[in-house]
């Protein structure tokens, strides 16, 4: 991704992407806010989280806490954290955007963010606390 956004097509100051999605990212959670807050190529940065993600559980065995399955230290100023963990029909799922889970709120979220619209504003997510974390409530 870094090489792509450093290419000449991105040489202007405009933000070419409306939404950048870090979907259950298999990257270190610790200190993510420092590099996340420097991402300049999108209007909104979404980070999706499922603490029970079966793919990232395997990664946890050899790596520190992963951003995509950790609900701690969510302190990036730019990121919009979307926590799917306790939502209906989420379970241990990793690939929500395929639409095979039966949760209409998840489908609506991905339809919106993949078409340059705001995902955190849809009914079914609730913001809790001062951080920019939204929790999936149900179907």
What kind of region is each of these model predictions?
Residues 1-3:
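Glycine-rich nucleophile elbow surrounding the catalytic serine of serine-hydrolase chemistry
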Residues 5-139:
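Lipolytic serine-hydrolase domain surface
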């Amino acid at each position: 991704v870094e090489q792509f956004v450093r290419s000449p097509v991105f040489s202007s100051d405009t933000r070419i992407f409306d939404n950048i999605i870090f979907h259950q990212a298999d990257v270190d959670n610790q200190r993510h806010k420092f590099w996340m807050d420097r991402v300049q190529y999108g209007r909104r940065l979404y980070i999706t989280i499922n603490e029970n993600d079966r793919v990232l559980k395997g990664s946890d065995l050899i790596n520190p806490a992963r951003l995509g399955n950790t609900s701690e230290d969510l302190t990036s100023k730019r990121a919009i954290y979307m926590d799917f963990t306790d939502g209906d029909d989420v379970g241990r799922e990793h690939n929500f955007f395929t639409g095979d889970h039966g949760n209409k709120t998840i489908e609506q979220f991905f339809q919106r963010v993949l078409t340059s619209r705001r995902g955190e504003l849809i009914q079914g997510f609730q913001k809790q606390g001062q951080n920019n974390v939204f929790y999936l409530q149900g179907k």
